[in-house]
Regions:
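A solvent-exposed, acidic/Ser-Thr-rich amphipathic alpha-helical stretch
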Residues: 40-41, 59-129, 142
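Beta-strand elements of well-folded, non-transmembrane domains
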Residues: 130-136, 152
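Short beta-strand segments enriched in hydrophobic/aromatic residues
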Residues: 67, 130-132, 165-168
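Short beta-strand edge/turn micro-motifs at domain boundaries
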Residues: 143-172
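Short, low-complexity N-terminal intrinsically disordered segments enriched in polar/charged residues
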Residues: 21, 29-69
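Bacterial Sec-dependent N-terminal signal peptides
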Residues: 1-37
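A short acidic/glycine-rich loop-to-helix N-cap element
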Residues: 32-34, 137-143, 171-174
Length: 174
């Protein structure tokens, strides 16, 4: 069976059009913002509040103001949680045994993609990888790694975490 492009297989114009299409696609797929922008730095700081302060140190009062009222958390192992369920799980599970499990951002993996409506910034997608450490007595061992994707929405000039996908959890083999 012949491809519909068979008559054009030797066409110079077709090769140019394909090259242009590949170039344009690469621009779109690499549209993350520079790490020196205010948006990148702001959302990296928000990530730090979520994990360094709330997850690692159990300062949950730092977390509540940045979580949207209609927040949803999707976890590949623990299921779906709304805002109330997520905060309760943080309190009872993560902070129920403080210092046992901690999270570290894989800094080089963090990417931020702005979301705009007619040129006006309304949100951003933040994604990356993180590792999880377990503390036994004085030994700290990296035990897991996972991917995350966060949807941030700008509400009244304040960034709110609206959706989180936490997935690809697996044992760390580093």
């Amino acid at each position: 069976m012949n491809s519909f492009l068979e008559p054009y297989k030797d066409s110079y114009l077709l090769k140019i059009l394909i090259a242009i299409a590949v170039f344009l696609f690469s621009l779109v797929t690499n549209a993350q913002i520079d790490r020196n922008t205010d948006l990148y730095k702001t959302l990296k700081a928000k990530d730090s509040i979520i994990f360094q302060r709330a997850f690692n140190k159990c300062e949950l009062e730092k977390l509540e103001p940045i979580i949207a009222e209609n927040f949803e958390f999707y976890h590949d192992l623990a299921g779906i949680q709304n805002r109330k369920e997520f905060m309760l799980a943080m309190k009872n599970n993560i902070c129920g045994n403080p210092g046992r499990i901690t999270r570290q951002l894989v800094a080089a993996s963090l990417e931020v993609f702005p979301l705009k409506n007619n040129g006006v910034l309304y949100g951003a997608i933040q994604k990356g990888k993180h590792t999880f450490q377990e503390k036994n007595n004085t030994e700290i061992k990296t035990v897991g790694i996972a991917d995350f994707t966060d949807l941030w929405i700008l509400e009244n000039n304040s960034w709110k975490l609206k959706r989180v996908l936490s997935y690809n959890h697996k044992p760390y083999k580093g």
